[in-house]
A protein has these predicted regions:
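Extended amphipathic ligand-handling, pore-lining, and cofactor/metal-binding catalytic surfaces
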Residues: 1-202
Length: 202
């Protein structure tokens, strides 16, 4: 998302704006409305056979930045494209796993128990995926009580964790590459004019 880290990247680029003819910064994965549709399609087409008929919960990082709203927008886009029961919960954002569990139990598609798939909505599956999401479950042990899997289990569900970052899906990588192609084309066009040195953003 276009959150804290991405804005730090842009600020860092500004410091060197005068040292190069041009600096180009491509868009984050979710920067424009079309990105949500593209990522929804890329993710669901990559996951649908694995998910089957079971509910899917994607674990995002979350942020105190206003871009935290991107997770709710991404969930809406996924549901609209997949026509499936999909949720996004975050580790450090406003949408918690408790919020999702409450929705699962009280919504129109309410499920009181049963299998639920947990998959990271992060580029790589690292510490958050292994600990905050799976809580040691991938090692054949009972999940930690404060992990996503542990809280789902305590609520009566049967969580199944997939330790795989979204960067492992070729269709998602293609969205990143499309952003790179866009900014490269923009950079080339800008360099053929008489523009002064500066920074180009996707």
């Amino acid at each position: 998302i276009d959150g804290i880290e991405n804005h730090r990247l842009k600020e860092a680029a500004k410091k060197y704006a005068g040292a190069f003819e041009q600096i180009a910064v491509a868009d984050a994965l979710l920067a424009k409305p079309q990105d949500y549709e593209d990522v929804a399609k890329a993710l669901w087409e990559s996951l649908k056979e694995e998910v089957g008929d079971f509910p899917l919960i994607l674990m995002g990082h979350g942020t105190e930045h206003a871009a935290d709203a991107s997770y709710a927008m991404m969930e809406q886009s996924l549901r609209a494209y997949a026509k499936h029961e999909i949720y996004i919960a975050t580790v450090e954002g406003s949408i918690t796993i408790e919020d999702v569990i409450a929705r699962m139990k009280s919504g129109l598609q309410s499920r009181q128990n049963g299998k639920v798939l947990l998959i990271p909505f992060m580029l790589v599956a690292g510490d958050h995926a292994n600990n905050d999401m799976a809580g040691g479950m991938q090692d054949g042990e009972q999940p930690d009580a404060d992990s996503f899997a542990g809280k789902l289990q305590a609520a009566g569900y049967q969580p199944e964790c997939v330790i795989r970052g979204i960067g492992e899906y070729p269709a998602v990588r293609e969205v990143y590459l499309a952003h790179l192609r866009q900014i490269t084309q923009k950079l080339f066009c800008d360099l053929t004019t008489e523009n002064r040195p500066g920074i180009l953003y996707g």
